[in-house]
A protein has these predicted regions:
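Hydrophobic/aromatic-enriched cytosolic interaction surfaces used to assemble or bind macromolecules
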Residues: 1-271
Length: 271
């Protein structure tokens, strides 16, 4: 598929993921001529979550500390269920890294908030939890800890939008699953050389998310029948297909896996 895709939704299940994407006008018209009147398409890709977990566990074990190109500041990567996703950088103003830790949410009534100062003294992160899990980011990074015990409690997280010129990240936790929403204006997620020294593409950001979600799926306290959805939205879709890039990247990463990609009936998605 060569046309641009404006959004891509991944629904993770215990045995893989379904991705649902928008069709281009040309594809929609071609489908209508064949009797298919839809603007969205869904496909299923099987994934061995234990393999994903092992692969990324090895990578993180080998590189627990990632340094910025100048080696001045380190970002520490903790254990499982912890996701750190850097945003796109807007030039020289945000090229420096800073140490980032995350709050731990233990129960429904607990409230936690903290902020992290950059070298210029500006706050970097503030996260809270009380009935609703709320997170907002004021600079370029956000960290969210996925702990299975909070999944039944939080109904949703307020989705974020248009924070500076970089990544806008929201997390929605609902009964029986959680949504991780990445909204990106422009192509910063695809080529973010400043914010991810070793893994420099948006696909690698997604790999990180898949790894930590696989840890959640492998946890015995999680209901494996509950799907997890990831929504990627490219605010200004370019000439490349998000779906095509995703599948190619996954194929490259898991070359020994059995990639039997098949079109699933539409009721699979909504079941």
């Amino acid at each position: 598929m060569t046309s641009a895709v404006s959004s891509l939704t991944l629904r993770l299940t215990a045995d893989g993921f379904v991705y649902l994407y928008d069709l281009s006008d040309e594809e929609t018209e071609a489908g209508a001529q064949e009797g298919y009147h839809t603007r969205r398409q869904s496909q299923f890709v099987p994934i061995d979550w234990s393999r994903v977990s092992a692969l990324w566990g090895d990578i993180i074990a080998q590189h627990p500390i990632l340094s910025d190109p100048e080696g001045e500041v380190r970002v520490l990567y903790p254990a499982s269920h912890y996701v750190v996703i850097p945003s796109g950088m807007s030039g020289e103003q945000d090229v420096h890294w800073w140490r980032l830790t995350a709050p731990i949410f233990a129960d429904e009534e607990q409230y936690y908030s903290d902020s992290y100062a950059l070298g210029d003294g500006k706050p970097g992160l503030a996260v809270g939890f009380s009935h609703l899990l709320k997170g907002f980011l004021q600079r370029s990074f956000v960290a969210c800890r996925f702990i299975p015990t909070i999944l039944p409690f939080a109904q949703r997280v307020l989705r974020q939008s248009s924070l500076q010129t970089g990544l806008s990240l929201g997390v929605e936790l609902i009964e029986g699953g959680c949504d991780l929403v990445l909204c990106q204006s422009g192509n910063l997620l695809r080529a973010n050389h400043y914010s991810w020294p070793r893994y420099r593409s948006w696909q690698h950001h997604l790999y990180q998310v898949l790894y930590f979600l696989s840890k959640v799926y492998l946890d015995s306290s999680v209901d494996h029948s509950a799907p997890v959805s990831i929504i990627l939205s490219d605010g200004t879709a370019g000439t490349d297909s998000l779906v095509g890039e995703l599948l190619q990247a996954l194929h490259r990463q898991f070359t020994t896996a059995d990639w039997d990609v098949s079109v699933m009936p539409i009721d699979y998605w909504y079941a």
